[in-house]
Amino acid sequence: MKHVLYEVTDDFDVIIKLTFENYSYLNAFIEQHTADKKYEPKFLVLEINAEGDIDFIRTYNGTREISKKYVVDYID
């Protein structure tokens, strides 16, 4: 699974975008990046499966996970 991280403003303007192949590297980056800032960064993380589809969308305030939403495909 691939993890695409966006650091965003309150208006969801993108500050940085990074991709991680490993969930532990993603968490380590969030912890280190939050510790380095004088403000609490906001993150949006897309979890992408092997087929290239988005499975989950997560939001964080600093290191605190605010929400995790499962993305469901609707087929007519």
Enumerate the predicted regions with their spans.
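Short amphipathic alpha-helices within nucleic acid-binding modules
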Residues: L26-F29
